[in-house]
Amino acid sequence: MNPRRGPIVAGEKIQFTDRKGKKITDQLTAGGVTQTEHGIILHDDVIGRTEGVVVTTVTAKREAQVNADHPERDRNKPWKATRAIGGWQYAVMRPRLADYVLSMPRGAQIMYPKDIAQVIQLGDIRSGLNVLESGAGSGAMSVNLLDAVGESGHLTTIELRPEFARVADANATLYYGERPRWWDLKTGDFDSVAAGLPEHSFDRIVLDMLDPWNRLEQAYRVIAPGGVLIAYITTTTQMSRLVEALREAGHWTEPAIQETLERTWKAQGLAVRPDHAMIGHTGFLVVSRAMAEGFAALRKRDRATKDTTTDIDSLTPEQREAQLDDLELRDISDHKLRKVLRDLDLQTSRLSQDDQACKQGEATAI
C-alpha cells in the first residue's frame, strides 16, 4: 500500500499548484504529460522526486529535446494541442484527502469535506471501530471512513447500485494504491443486506440515503448499545421525517440536528476580509445513539404546538415514493457514468502496470 510519503512513484495522484493557487490533480504515468493552460508538465520530471519541489512547464527548447529523445512519439504527440507558452511553475504535492475527494471522478454527487469532517467528529469515528455505511455514492465518505478507522478497524459499505459501487471501489483503490483490506463493499438494498449481518456488531452507522427513516429497524438490530447513528440528508422534509421516526421508535436518544456553513477569509497585510463566496447549505446531519434493549430513551416534555401534522401526512404511500424520486440527488446520465467508469478502469489498470514495472526494475538491479 502506498504510504503516501517518500519519493513519488508512477500511478500516484499528484496535485500541481501554480502561484495563483490554481490546482490540477492528475495521475502520473511513465512518459506521460499533464496538459495545462500554460504548457505541459512532463511526468518524468516528477516521478522519483519528493513532495514540495517545483516543476516548470515545457518550453519550445525542452519540447525539442523530448522529441529527440523519443522520436517514436512524433506521430502522436499529446502536447501538440497545448499552447506553447512554457516556463510556468507548479508546486508538486500529494493531494490532501479533502482535495482528492473534490477532484476524483464521480458517479454520484459527493458530500463536501466540511460535512464529512463533521460526520467523523460528531460520530466519534476513530481507529479500531467497526463502522457500517449505507450509500457509497462516489466513495467520498467511504475513503474518509477508511482513513478514520484505519487498518485496525473495519468498514462495511452497502450500496444499492452496482455501478456506483464500482466507482467508489475504484476511487478508494486509487487513493490507497491498492484496495483497502479492511473494507467490505456490498451491493443491494440496505434492509436485505443488513439482515445478514450479526446483531449488535457495529459501533457506528453512517446513513447517506433518501429515506433513512425506513431503515431504522435494521440499523437498531446491528448497532451496539450506545453506538452512534449519524445520517446525512439534504432537505427539511427528510430531516423532519427522520427525527420523528427516531423519537417514535423509542430506543434512540433525542436526535441532534446540525448544519455546517463554511466561509474562507483573505488576509493581505492589514486588509483582512471574508471571501465574497462561501459554501452554504449542503445538507443536515442528524445524530442519535442507541439505547440498550428493553430501555426507552428519556424525553423532555415539550409544550404542545398547533402544528402536529405536515403536508406529507396526507399523502398516499405511492405519492410519498414519488416525492422521494423527485429528491433523487444521485441521478447521472448513463453516458456520463460509462465515461467515469472507463476513466477509473484505465487509472486502476495503471496501478498494476506500474507495480509490475517496479518489481521488474528491482529484479534487474539484483
What are these regions (language model features)?
Residues 216-287, 292:
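C-terminal substrate-binding/active-site "lid" region of AdoMet-derived donor-dependent transferases
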Residues 158-212:
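S-adenosyl-L-methionine
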Residues 129, 153, 227:
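Glycine-centered, small-residue-biased loops immediately flanking beta-strands
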Residues 123-125, 149, 222-223, 227:
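A generic alpha-to-beta junction signature in SAM-dependent methyltransferases
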Residues 138-151, 220-221:
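Conserved SAM-binding loop of SAM-dependent methyltransferases across substrates and taxa
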Residues 1-94:
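N-terminal auxiliary segments of SAM/dcSAM-dependent transferases
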Residues 3-6, 10, 17-26, 30-32, ...:
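C-terminal lobe and adjacent flexible extensions of AdoMet/dcAdoMet transferase-like proteins
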Residues 126-137:
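Conserved class I S-adenosyl-L-methionine
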